[in-house]
Amino acid sequence: MFTKIKRRLPWWTKIVAKLVLSRSPLSYSDWQKLALFRHGYMHDPGYALGVFDTHVTRSGIRENFHGKTILEIGPGDSIATTIISRSHDARAILVDIGPFATEDTLPYLALCELLGKQGLKPPEISSAHTLEDILLACDGEYLTEGLTSWKQVSS
């Protein structure tokens, strides 16, 4: 229902509405459940893989991932980059201003399935119950304290 309404509204009304609604006491996850606020679409496996492929192609590291560390600023609703990086024998450090990544492991399992179908070797996360379990399996980091997190990024 909200999606149909959102499509019909001019862009400027959406901005005004978001500014007004952001002042309410609801958390980001509450707004996300209502489909009113979302930090991108990286929870969608196909979309996440497409974005990753675009970025690594533009960066020139497409063919040489081994041992690389990928830094993602503002991963939004997902830690998908960590899983995709590990599938390419690399690791990822994700930095955001808050813990916005979905705790639901199903999108991450679906991503691993897609990566496997593409001939990659995704990390084993079938027994993972938390984001920490997934990050551990991927040798990844998810830093969620904004500018303070930069001090924790190893060079």
Language model features: what each stretch is:
Residues 76-78, 98-100, 148-149:
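Short, solvent-exposed loop/turn segments at secondary-structure junctions
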Residues 91-116:
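Long, hydrophobic, well-ordered secondary-structure blocks that form the structural core
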